[in-house]
Amino acid sequence: VTLVSGPVSLPDPTGVKVVRIETARQMLDAVQAALPADIAVCAAAVADWRVAAEAGQKLKKDGSGVIPDLKLSENPDILATISQKGPKRPDLVVGFAAETENVIEHARAKRARKGCDWILANDVAPGTGTFGGDHNEVFLISGADGASDEVWPRQGKAGVARALVQRISRHFA
């Protein structure tokens, strides 16, 4: 098992190779270096955009009220990249979707757009208590038609992780 992780304050899991990264490009490179693999669980919330050119130092206010003009560049799409057909594609690619409206519809569209096998989606709209909260209601989207979608009970993150491991085990049984 290889864990590609950005900066966190959590201890490394026992028995896991941990690769530390700081940028989306580094994450993509590390994930690709870990392939081939049977399963890829892509849970990181990688930003869609990055600053095109780093300033190299803090951009300080000068009192003029002029806001700096920041140009953005698109970050690599890690989930879509590893979901592409090819000899190193994992047998099962799982992505995540945090949605604020039309959760299942948007998750189905994301699954199709990215080319992954499953999407675990949750509703993060204000009032759900998901952001900053301890519990999630999760939807497993595993087909285009909705016939194989699953609604998981509201549970903590550790419970969601256990349920995902059990679901993956059943998939490969």
Q: Model-flagged regions — what are they?
A:
Residues 1-173:
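A cross-family phosphate/adenosyl-ligand binding-site feature
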